[in-house]
Amino acid sequence: GPFGPLTIIGGKMSMVDGRMVQTMDSRYPTCTDGDTIAKQIRAAIGTGAELTDVGSAKPFYIEADTPAIKACIDTYNEVTGENATPFTMGGGTYARHFPYAVSFGPEHSDMVLPEFGGPMQGATEAAPIDKLLEALKIYIIALLRLEEIDF
């Protein structure tokens, strides 16, 4: 599916009421769902273990060839001169809380950060001013183009 392969990681382990508890986190493609995965895990669990407190969210995905996605990526490429393509990511973003939204923004892994700056989503997240101004230009143009689309 669009999200790539199924991944499941072991999270925090702790002792609760004399029992070992292991949390798990899975990222799954759009071709399956949390209930199916939980059923398969339960079938594979050995004696003395159980899978409880299962929660899941349906994968959130919008096709890359929709007018809105094309407007965003075309704007990004025109402003930056790049030839970027839309991509999906495992994990949730704020976009899943809206019926037709995507997370959209610049990400430059080769960007030289200011001396005081840290990485994306860190306490000292920073970017050079020229990249912030470029992002602002991208957002303004993309929003104007999105305004023309009939959703």
Predicted regions and their residues:
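Midchain, well-structured core segments that form catalytic/ion-binding scaffolds
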Residues: 1-32, 39
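Short, low-order "capping/linker" segments at domain edges
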Residues: 2, 61-78, 105
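A short linear hydrophobic-aromatic micro-motif
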Residues: 9-11, 50, 82-88
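Zn-dependent metallopeptidase/amidohydrolase metal-coordination segment
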Residues: 16, 74, 82-149
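A generic structural motif
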Residues: 22-24, 58-61
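Transmembrane helical segments that form the transport core of multi-pass membrane transport proteins
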Residues: 24, 46-47
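Short amphipathic alpha-helices in soluble, non-transmembrane regions
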Residues: 35-46
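Conserved short beta-strand edge segments in small beta-sheet-based binding/regulatory domains
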Residues: 47-55
